[in-house]
Amino acid sequence: MHKPLRNSHPLFKIANNALVDLPAPINISSWWNFGSLLGLCLIIQILTGLFLAMHYTADVNLAFYSVNHICRDVNYGWLLRTLHANGASFFFICIYLHIGRGIYYGSYLFTPTWLVGVIILFLVMGTAFMGYVLPWGQMSFWGATVITNLLSAIPYLGMDLVQWLWGGFAVDNATLTRFFTFHFILPFIVLAMTMIHLLFLHQTGSNNPIGLNSNIDKIPFHPYFTFKDIVGFIVMIFILISLVLISPNLLGDPDNFIPANPLVTPAHIQPEWYFLFAYAILRSIPNKLGGVIALVLSIAILMILPFYNLSKFRGIQFYPINQILFWSMLVTVILLTWIGARPVEEPYVLIGQILTIIYFLYYLINPLVTKWWDNLLN
């Protein structure tokens, strides 16, 4: 009997098993759209970034003006740049919603998939940080100086590491050149890690909103979820294009319109909005090394979730108290984002410290409350 090409060709077969004939749970909601939206974001970022790299110059004397040149003189350069800058914001919105979904519905119990996902998050954060340095504005330069300088907190090796990273005794041309190189290569590493993420996911199949085994009731991915994903694509692209065409600099920092000047420090150094919660956690620890450890742990703590699960049911859909804790944690992250953009003075410092404690306590208390609730039901 004649088989369709998608089932017989060795290359198409891989794509077919991942995107067409993949058995998917019948009841997955729109919260499961964010994986494909992240794939779309990554493609948008790689394509716009590729064209931007054709016109960008990684030199301290020319970088700022090359970005200016892209926006003024290159055909649709303004569109490429604003799509790329705001695309990063949408990437992080989707990634945070994707992680939130994973925490809520217990998707972290797919341990290898979850751990690869956290590694992808670290890589994406590194990529975004280095991309923010490239326009070589005031906030680019001082952000790079402050964040890379955190490595000096590492005992014994610190200063050597910082100078090795900088390529000199300060953030300068060597730093900009290597950041551009890494910013170019990392998205392709993220792409490779995404393939591994999907490979692990397809070993187990997707989770679903009730957290039960759905093998008895699955449907093919195409056409059902391809069309559902396309609806998500259209909504996200519409919002992204609206932002880009109406208010492209809304999420940026005005200080970055000033060329980098090592002799003038901005009044308030802060990263892009999607890093502010982690920046607030960093600042809330009055010790440099402690702050760096807290900064890394604020993301790395996600890795403990698969190993610290005490509940009988998957996810927190059936745990009312845990739902209150979860939404409280979400509010905590939003408030930390707000604190990260505030100056280092009272009462912001104290609020940041309290919120940091609440943030970390969530990961420790949540499994204990599920255990208590299970015991209550026995």
UniProtKB/Swiss-Prot annotation:
**Cofactor remark:** Binds 2 heme b groups non-covalently.
A Gene Ontology term for the protein's cellular component:
mitochondrial inner membrane
- InterPro entries, sorted: Cyt_b/b6_C, Cyt_b/b6_C_sf, Cyt_b/b6_N, Cytb/b6-like_sf, Cytochrome_b, Cytochrome_b_C_euk/bac, Cytochrome_b_N_euk/bac, Di-haem_cyt_TM
| ATP-binding listed as a keyword | no
Gene Ontology BP, a term? mitochondrial electron transport, ubiquinol to cytochrome c
Q: Where, subcellularly, is it found?
A: Mitochondrion inner membrane
Q: Indicate the principal place this protein occupies in or around the cell.
A: mitochondrion
Listed under subunit, the entry gives: The main subunits of complex b-c1 are: cytochrome b, cytochrome c1 and the Rieske protein.
Q: Which family does it belong to?
A: Belongs to the cytochrome b family.
Miscellaneous note, as given in the UniProt record, is:
Heme 1 (or BL or b562) is low-potential and absorbs at about 562 nm, and heme 2 (or BH or b566) is high-potential and absorbs at about 566 nm.
The name this protein goes by in its record? Cytochrome b
User: What organism is recorded for this protein?
Assistant: Drosophila yakuba
